[in-house]
C-alpha cells in the first residue's frame, strides 16, 4: 500500500499572547442568542460559550497565533533575553467567569453543582481545591471591572485562550498584562481586552510548570525582573478545572484531575518532553473481566504478567498518556478554517429581529439534540468507552507474539464506582468493601451521576447536556409507554421520590425527571467485547465518495502515469461525473432536485396520466442507459480500466476533520468531538502496547518513563498510513510582525514593548488533520490466508447478503413509490367497488392475486400494467441493492449502479448501501414535550406548559428533535454535516518485512439500536450515519422530518407493508392505534413518514386519524378509530360480482409464443414476454463474456 509523501507547507502566523480577558457591559441585544449557544447551570455565575466572531470576539480575530511561552538567555555571557514562541490556535470555547447570571441557564434543572460534586466523590475523582495562600492573591471580577470602569453588576467577563494553554491558566501559571489592554468592537459595542501571558516569561530557560506561582522569590526569576501577580480567579479556575480538565480526566481514567491539568500544561511548555506525563501514583478501576477471564484491576493470587492484570493496567495508563501527548500536539496545530462568523450564518439571513434570529438558532440546536442523544444512549459511544480490557496474548504459548487487538476500550460508565486499585493491584485506602459491578450483566440504572461523569463533572456542560436531552424523544410515538410527566409530578407530592436535588415546584425540570422520561432509551451494557467506537465528528469538505458505488472508477484510478491529460478530462470519465450528468439531466426534466434528493421535483404536475408515467420511466431509463454505456466504453476502450477489479476495490469513503472550528457552535458539541478524538487516539495507542511490552521487564519502576517515548513514537508513525492523515507544517512568524510583550522590568501595568527578539520553538511539526472513514461496496468473502475465526465470521454474514429468489411485490419494487403517489392519475378507476377513492394497495393486491375483475380494466390500463410489470421484473432480475427506491433520484442511481454491476458480472450478494439519518427539528408535538420548560411547576405545571404552547413563538428554545432518512448521501455530505457513526479501526502490517502499521477506519454501527436513534435498523447490508447539516441546512428543505419509532412497532408496521394486501392502510392504522392509543392523534405527517417511509400511506394515516376524530366529535376514541379502520378495510375488501378476472400471474409470462392478453390485435411489444425485446431494445441483456484480448464495449 502506497501512501502520499509527506510534504511540508510553510505557514506564517502572527505573534501574540496565550489569551485575552474580554470585559464588556452586558449587551442589550443578542444576549438571548448568546445564552442559547452557551452552557450554563442555573446555580452558578459562570458559563462556557462558543468562540463566534461578532458575538464573543471581534471581526478580524486571528485564530492562529505564535504564542509567547517563555524566554531564553542569549549572548556570550547569557545576559540578553529573547522570547520563545510556540504555534497554537484559539480554543473554540470561551469561559465566562463573571456576569454569567445575565445569560439564561441552559436548563431549569436545579442543583446541578451539587449533583456534580456528589458524582465526583462517588466515582473517586478529585475536587478543585485552591491552596489557602492562593486565595489571598485572587484577582476578582469585581476588581477588574473597577479598574476598567465597568459596572460589576452589568458586566460580562470571559477568557479567550489558546487551545494548548487552558490548563496553564487553570493552575495559575499566567498573569494579566494590564498595561497592554486595548479596546475592540463586537456587535457595535466597545469591549476591553486584556492580554494574558505565561509567568515563564520572567524565568529564562525555564520550560516547566511553576509549582509555586505566587513565590516572588523563585530562584529562576531573572535578575532585575519585576515578577507580576499571577492571575488567579477562583470561579474561572474552577470552570476550567471542570469543563476543560474534567472531561480529559474521565476519558483518560485519571482520578487525580489536578495532575491531568499539570501534565497537559507541562506538555505545552516543554516541547522536548519525552517521558511519562501522568503521575506515577495513578489509580485504576477494578472490574471483573468479560467472558469468564481473570479479574482485571484486582489481584488474583499475586500472579504477574497478563494473568495478574498488570499489563492491562500498564497499557491503560500508557495509552492515556500517549493520547494526552497527541492531544497536546493537535493543540499546537494551525488550521485553515477561520472561526465561525455569526453575520455569515445562513439560518440568520432574512431574520430582521433578535427574537427571529434566536428562534432560528433554537431550531438548529434542536437538530443537534438527535446526535447528542445518540452519543449518550449508544452503548459503544466514545463517552462510555472509558476502561481498558485485555483479551490476552494472541498466542497463549508465545506471549511475545504481537497483537494489535489485545488491549481495547470497553464501556466503563457503569463500573466507575468500583473500588480503585494501585499499580500493583491493591485496593486503595478508602475503597475497601465497595461492591464490584461486572462489566457485563450488571443491574445498575443509568443515573444523573453517570450523566455528570460523561460531562467531566462540569455543571455548565451537564446543563447543556440536559438542554439537548430535554429535546429528545423518549418514546412518544414508538409503542413504549412513555412517562406522563404531569402525572409523575402530581403523584410525587404524595410519594417519596428518590431525588434530593429538587422540590415539588422544580421536579418537572429535574435531571432525575428527564432521565426517567427517557428511561426506555438508557444504554444497556450487555457486551464488553472489542468493537466499534461511536464517534461524533464533522465533515468539513463538500467532497465525499458516498455514491451508490462509492469511489468506483475514481480520478486516482483513471489517471495515467505520464500525466498527459488535464484533470478536467479525467474527471469527465469517472463514475462520479457520470452520476452528476444523470442527475443534472433529470433535474433539467424537472424530475429531481439535486440539492434535496428526497424531493419529487415537479412530478406532481408532470404525471397527470398513464402516458406521462411511461414517459418519465422511459426517460429515466434512457438517460441512465446512455451514460452507463458511454462510461463503460470510455473505461474499457479508452483507458483499458480493469473494471471488474475496480469494483472489488471500490469503497464508500468520507473524512472527518480534526479542525475545532468546523464543529457546531456549542460547547457540548465540542466536548463530544474532543471525547471522540481521545477515544480514537487511545485505540491507536492501545494497538501498539503489546508490541512495546513484548520481551521487556514491564514490572520495573522505570518502565513507563523509559518506554513512553517508544509508544509515543509508534503512534506518531501511524500518521498517513491509511486512517489518520497528517499535514507537515513549517511555522514562521508573519513578515514584518513585531513581537510585543510585557516589559520584564517595568511591571505588569507598564505598556508593552516591541523591541524583543524571538523565534518559534517548534518550527516543523506533523499535525493530524482528519480521520478517513470507509466502507467496502461489495461484500467480500474471506481471503485464502484468513484465520479460521475470520472465515467463520464471513460465513455468518453470507446469509445476510445473499439475494433471495422470491419475486418482489410490485408496490415494493422500483416503481412502487410512483404507483402509490400517482395511482389516481394512472388508474383512475382503480378503486374498490362502492368507493370513490382510488386505492393502490387494493388495486395491486387484487391484481397480483388474480382477483381483479377483467371488466374493470381498459386496454390502456392493460398496456400500463404490462409496462410496469416488465420494468419491475427486469429491474428485479439485475438488482443487487437491498433497498427499494423512494424517489426518482434513488431510482436513477440504483438503476445506474445495477447496470454497472451487470457489466461487471456481479451476482449472488447484495452490495453495501449507505443511509443518512438527517436530524431535523420542529415545535413540540404535544404539551407533554414542553413540560421541562414550563415556567410554573408543581400544581401549575400543566397550565404552565399549555401557556408556553399557546405562545410557543415567544420561546426560541422550544423545539424538539426529529429525523428523516435519505439513501443518497452525497448531497447530505455536501452540506458538511456534523455526524455520529460507528468507527472500527483495523491495523495491519504492509508487505512482508515491512514494519509499518497501516490502518483502515471502517464504517461500523452504533450499538444500542433504536435507543441510540429511532430510525436505526439492524441490517448488515446497510451502513448508517446520523447527520446534522451545517452548510445552509439544504437537506432540511425536504421537510421529511420524522419522529422516533420503536423496534416492536416499527418492525410490525414495516412487516405489514412488506406483506402487502389490499388493506395495508387499515392494518397499519389498527396496529398503531392498538400500540399507541390516544397518542396516535399526536402523530404528524412527518412522524408517519419516519415510521413508514411511504408518503402515500402517511397521507392515508392522517386522513384516517381525521376521520376518527370526526367520528368522536373532536375527541379521541379508540373504538371510533378502530371502527373507521374496519370500515376502510371492508371497503377495499369488496370485489363485487367479479365475473371473469384478470390473470396477472400468466400475463407477461416468459413464453415467447404466448398470445398477448386482449387478442391478436393487441400491440405486440407492450405485451411481449420477459425475454422478448422491449421496443426493439432490451436494456437488461446478458452479462459480459470472459475477457479475451483487448475488450471493446461491443464485446460486452
Curated annotation (Swiss-Prot):
Signal peptide: none
Coiled coil: none
UniProt-annotated location(s): Host nucleus
Compositional bias of kind Basic and acidic residues: 1174-1196
Keyword Cell membrane included in the entry's annotation: no
Motif Required for filament formation: positions: 843-844, 1142-1144
InterPro entries named in the record: DBP_sf, Viral_ssDBP_head, Viral_ssDNA-bd
Keyword terms of this UniProt record: DNA replication, DNA-binding, Host nucleus, Metal-binding, Zinc, Zinc-finger
Keyword DNA-binding carried by entry: yes
Cystine pairings recorded for this chain: none
Residue segments, region Disordered: 1158-1196
Annotated Gene Ontology cellular component terms: host cell nucleus
GO biological process: DNA double-strand break processing involved in repair via single-strand annealing; DNA replication
GO terms for MF: single-stranded DNA binding; zinc ion binding
Region span, Required for nuclear localization: 1170-1196
Zn-finger region bounds: unnamed: 499-512
Main localisation: host cell
Its biological purpose: Plays several crucial roles in viral infection. Participates in the opening of the viral DNA origin to initiate replication by interacting with the origin-binding protein. May disrupt loops, hairpins and other secondary structures present on ssDNA to reduce and eliminate pausing of viral DNA polymerase at specific sites during elongation. Promotes viral DNA recombination by performing strand-transfer, characterized by the ability to transfer a DNA strand from a linear duplex to a complementary single-stranded DNA circle. Can also catalyze the renaturation of complementary single strands.
Similarity-based family: Belongs to the herpesviridae major DNA-binding protein family.
Subunit and partners: Homooligomers. Forms double-helical filaments necessary for the formation of replication compartments within the host nucleus. Interacts with the origin-binding protein. Interacts with the helicase primase complex; this interaction stimulates primer synthesis activity of the helicase-primase complex. Interacts with the DNA polymerase. Interacts with the alkaline exonuclease; this interaction increases its nuclease processivity.
Name of this chain's protein: Major DNA-binding protein
Source organism (scientific name): Human herpesvirus 1 (strain KOS)
